[in-house]
Amino acid sequence: MSKINKLEHIRNIGICAHIDAGKTTTTERILYYTGKSHKIGEVHEGGATMDWMEQEQERGITITSAATTCRWQDKIINIIDTPGHVDFTIEVERSLRVLDGAVAVFDGVAGVEPQSETVWRQADKYNVPRMCFVNKMDRMGADFYRCVEMLKDRLGAKPLVIQLPVGIEENFKGIIDLIKMKAVIWKDEALGAEYFEEDIPADMKDKAEEYRAKLLDMVVELDDHVMEKYLSGEEVTAEEIKRLIRKGTISAAFYPVLCGSAFKNKGVQPLLDAVVDFLPSPIDIGIVKGMEVSTGAEKDFPISVTEPFAALAFKIMNDPFVGSLTFIRIYSGKITSGTTVINTVKNKREKIGRMLLMHANNREDVKEASAGDIVALAGLKDTTTGDTLSDIDQQVILERMEFPEPVIELAVEPKSTADQEKMGLALSRLAAEDPSFRVSTDYETGQTVIKGMGELHLEIIIDRMRREFKVEANIGAPQVAYRETITKVCEIDYTHKKQSGGAGQFARVKIIFEPLKEVKDLKDEDKNKNFVFESKIIGGAVPKEYIPGVEKGLNNIRETGVIAGYPMIDFKATLVDGAFHDVDSSVLAFEIAAKAAFREGMPKGNPKLLEPIMQVEVITPDEYMGDIIGDLNSRRGQIQSMDPRGNAQVVTANVPLAEMFGYVNTLRSLSQGRAQFSMIFSHYDQVPSQVADIIKAKK
């Protein structure tokens, strides 16, 4: 391993796509042809190597990004298989953070689907170079050229077509390589392992020439010398074309587009060649952003084996044989088993025990790993997703990952009291694995409440609790994660006094509460916060050491708002005055005063209930359009847009989450199962007063 494990030989890639575009099948074929998998696993039979959790095999969707290492030519390819279902976009975002490049798989029939757009935008956020594989070219209605147009219209991407399909639908038999200007045809009987080159079929010559010219026009722009050569009529060599495609892919000047049918074993080897030829190695990425712990300075750290060790933990998984596994991407330096490193986010030391290279669900022990590698570490105590592991002497914190707030919650209780402790352990393990899943206890009812990104997300958590931890649970109806806020500025002056024998308590606070959107001089770093606290105490009216007590009190009490007990968000609290007593004042006294000030002051701020609004996208045949729009309107939805997509219509609407429970069944019956939808969290908005009254009455 170590001889060829040099940085320029590594490709860290993700394979991402819409659910059902054939992403897992494509990954399976890659593992098969790179010699890592001896039997091809079919998703629809529930046997794919990457989909190794039982729930994934049953549902035929990929939930956990399993990291797999394989070889092609003399390169090492680390593949992160990412989920394509909208409830799991957090997993995709997490994988994109540690990748150097990605292959976006598109369905040749459906083209660019809603989740593909979400994933593409996430990849844009992390500047991930990528190429496109138009899959399912053997299916009825597959249209490569329409897909390419959709890449432009839908994603605003610049596709660079480097292959054309030979034959369509059931007659699809190979591709035209526009770099070599040769046809590549697969033998059906050899499971796609055998293919041969031949001249381009006569009926495709003109189309191949047309697309070859388009390809050259785009790539020569990246190099003046080659441009001159091209314009003067000289032949541009295949090597020059490849070099420029690589340059343009890495700089995101364009996205190479390939085609094939993973299920029919056609087009996978040229896809692997393209991964190696065009996607970046860690050296091409060059740097990773982070902060030096000793100085607090933001810095760009070089990706290099000779630099001090720095790695990012991007995934935690429970393995039935090894226990907890932490997947890390090493950005610089190297580690060996037995070394001690530091988790710089938590300031805790971690000893490196077993290090494993993962192949979907098999593992290989390694003693050393270095920059560019993706490995799993067994037995880390304090490290969670998004933490940095670093060299003890030169400590750095790599860029943190941001995780969205959950929008749906439900109460769970174990079926027997004996399972209470087991359930607590199971949920805390699952929460460590998945930062978009939260667990809390409702103090009033004593119930355990779990929160997540959607119904499917929580269903799978409960399913895993049952299978992996053997905990049976009763589940409450899903609840919407409402919030509260204030709509006008209010001021409160409150004195907390308790002087009945023994040590007394005294604290006076004067606080101004204001809606965040009305704060004029809000700092940039505070704009995305739910709550901002500032002290404007001058002249020691409240001593410095007591001010954290005020902030702590407000932070705790805002979890139970004044309308219906939901967390209070989007407001700023400014401590402007106060008073203290030399003997009777304490941090605790100021904490109590702040809580009471909140309770008394907030009702004066005209508080309102907020609800999560989801962006819902429905794709439907024309004939059901009227019924579907009528139904969305009846759910308090606001239609944002209606666009034709092929022979279907796409309706985008903002709909309150509270109205979306069970929508999948309604949509199925409205469209005889032909329409599909996806939804993602958009924003919080005020609840209409008549709905707010119903919610308050239920609390």
Swiss-Prot record:
<dbReference type="GO" id="GO:0032790">
    <property type="term" value="P:ribosome disassembly"/>
</dbReference>
<keyword id="KW-0251">Elongation factor</keyword>
<dbReference type="InterPro" id="IPR000795">
    <property type="entry name" value="T_Tr_GTP-bd_dom"/>
</dbReference>
<keyword id="KW-0342">GTP-binding</keyword>
<dbReference type="InterPro" id="IPR035647">
    <property type="entry name" value="EFG_III/V"/>
</dbReference>
<dbReference type="GO" id="GO:0005737">
    <property type="term" value="C:cytoplasm"/>
</dbReference>
<dbReference type="InterPro" id="IPR004540">
    <property type="entry name" value="Transl_elong_EFG/EF2"/>
</dbReference>
<dbReference type="InterPro" id="IPR035649">
    <property type="entry name" value="EFG_V"/>
</dbReference>
<dbReference type="InterPro" id="IPR047872">
    <property type="entry name" value="EFG_IV"/>
</dbReference>
<comment type="similarity">
    <text>Belongs to the TRAFAC class translation factor GTPase superfamily. Classic translation factor GTPase family. EF-G/EF-2 subfamily.</text>
</comment>
<dbReference type="Pfam" id="PF03764">
    <property type="entry name" value="EFG_IV"/>
</dbReference>
<dbReference type="InterPro" id="IPR031157">
    <property type="entry name" value="G_TR_CS"/>
</dbReference>
<dbReference type="GO" id="GO:0005525">
    <property type="term" value="F:GTP binding"/>
</dbReference>
<comment type="function">
    <text>Catalyzes the GTP-dependent ribosomal translocation step during translation elongation. During this step, the ribosome changes from the pre-translocational (PRE) to the post-translocational (POST) state as the newly formed A-site-bound peptidyl-tRNA and P-site-bound deacylated tRNA move to the P and E sites, respectively. Catalyzes the coordinated movement of the two tRNA molecules, the mRNA and conformational changes in the ribosome.</text>
</comment>
<dbReference type="InterPro" id="IPR053905">
    <property type="entry name" value="EF-G-like_DII"/>
</dbReference>
<dbReference type="InterPro" id="IPR000640">
    <property type="entry name" value="EFG_V-like"/>
</dbReference>
<feature type="binding site">
    <location>
        <begin position="135"/>
        <end position="138"/>
    </location>
    <ligand>
        <name>GTP</name>
    </ligand>
</feature>
<dbReference type="Pfam" id="PF00009">
    <property type="entry name" value="GTP_EFTU"/>
</dbReference>
<dbReference type="InterPro" id="IPR027417">
    <property type="entry name" value="P-loop_NTPase"/>
</dbReference>
<dbReference type="Pfam" id="PF22042">
    <property type="entry name" value="EF-G_D2"/>
</dbReference>
<feature type="domain" description="tr-type G">
    <location>
        <begin position="8"/>
        <end position="283"/>
    </location>
</feature>
<feature type="binding site">
    <location>
        <begin position="17"/>
        <end position="24"/>
    </location>
    <ligand>
        <name>GTP</name>
    </ligand>
</feature>
<dbReference type="InterPro" id="IPR009022">
    <property type="entry name" value="EFG_III"/>
</dbReference>
<keyword id="KW-0963">Cytoplasm</keyword>
<dbReference type="GO" id="GO:0003924">
    <property type="term" value="F:GTPase activity"/>
</dbReference>
<dbReference type="InterPro" id="IPR005517">
    <property type="entry name" value="Transl_elong_EFG/EF2_IV"/>
</dbReference>
<dbReference type="Pfam" id="PF00679">
    <property type="entry name" value="EFG_C"/>
</dbReference>
<keyword id="KW-0648">Protein biosynthesis</keyword>
<dbReference type="InterPro" id="IPR020568">
    <property type="entry name" value="Ribosomal_Su5_D2-typ_SF"/>
</dbReference>
<keyword id="KW-0547">Nucleotide-binding</keyword>
<feature type="binding site">
    <location>
        <begin position="81"/>
        <end position="85"/>
    </location>
    <ligand>
        <name>GTP</name>
    </ligand>
</feature>
<dbReference type="InterPro" id="IPR014721">
    <property type="entry name" value="Ribsml_uS5_D2-typ_fold_subgr"/>
</dbReference>
<dbReference type="InterPro" id="IPR041095">
    <property type="entry name" value="EFG_II"/>
</dbReference>
<dbReference type="Pfam" id="PF14492">
    <property type="entry name" value="EFG_III"/>
</dbReference>
<dbReference type="InterPro" id="IPR005225">
    <property type="entry name" value="Small_GTP-bd"/>
</dbReference>
<dbReference type="GO" id="GO:0003746">
    <property type="term" value="F:translation elongation factor activity"/>
</dbReference>
<dbReference type="InterPro" id="IPR009000">
    <property type="entry name" value="Transl_B-barrel_sf"/>
</dbReference>
<protein>
    <recommendedName>
        <fullName>Elongation factor G</fullName>
    </recommendedName>
</protein>
